[in-house]
Amino acid sequence: MKPEDFSSYWLQLEQELILVEPAPECTEIPLRSTPEGKVFGLLLTSLGGYRIFAYYCVPHGKGPFPVIYRLPNYGSVVHIPPFEERCNHISIALCHRGQRLSDEPFAASYPGLLTQGIESPQTYIYRAIASDCLRVMDFLLTCEEVDHRRISLVGGDLALWTAAMRPQALTLFYTPSMVYKSLQKASTSSHYPLEEFNDYFRAFPKSRKQVETTLEYFEPMNFAPRVSISTMMMEESEGDGDDLMAAFGREIDRCTTYHSSFRDGVRQAQWIADKLKTGEPLLPEHWT
């Protein structure tokens, strides 16, 4: 169920973020740069004065360049964007607070992050993580080398939240992840990260109502109606995203994962290239 104050909750976050000076610092990482482009370590200040890190990759040549912004998955380590992608796009990969390279003063626990502060919508860690995602998008919109009309968001629920609150992006390639219908799925699963919810309820058996209330503010179905940009949703299995499709309230592209990094990667690259109008995508040799 969508909370009555859903919009005001997220508006408050944005208002808090506006008051924080981003203070960007961009330092080249020579070991990672190539003849095709440079790789930078980008530091930004996010909510609460927290410094976050992102890999910021800029190709050589005359810009502005289209952008692929990769929102992080659930895990401690974020990798540099793929080489082929970096050759003709600005490619940026965020390490949100708690992930490695953004882990001072807070180093996230895995498992554990998914329920950090979940007793209240105001203290849930993903409220601050959402601000990290928005901070990077706001940075991109200030960069002269960025083609502001061609920004593609790629990722799970963090990418969906960003698309809902930053409609300046052009496209969203979205894979529903751990927050989508999370407690319903956790009730029939013993696999992590969803098992983190079950662990939490075993430790705090009277907390279920509080957790349900918090997660309603982060449920993808409550964000979907706010996403107006061109969207591809890749679901785990056929029919898994039916409720999300209904929540979007419009036609979006939809596919089911092949459970193959090669086949899913080719499809993703081709869809993004078509939407950004960058021609045939450059793919890894072992994919061709």
Segments predicted by a language model, with ranges:
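Alpha/beta-hydrolase fold nucleophile elbow
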Residues: 144-155
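N-terminal targeting or regulatory segments adjacent to alpha/beta-hydrolase or S9 domains
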Residues: 1-37, 274, 278-288
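N-terminal cap/lid segment of alpha/beta-hydrolase-fold proteins
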Residues: 18-62
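Active-site glycine-rich loops that stabilize anionic/oxyanionic intermediates
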Residues: 47, 61, 65, 70-77
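Hydrolase active-site cap/lid region
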Residues: 159-205
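Cap/lid segment of the alpha/beta-hydrolase catalytic domain
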Residues: 79, 83, 89-131
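The feature captures the conserved acid-bearing segment of alpha/beta-hydrolase catalytic domains
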Residues: 188-249, 253-257
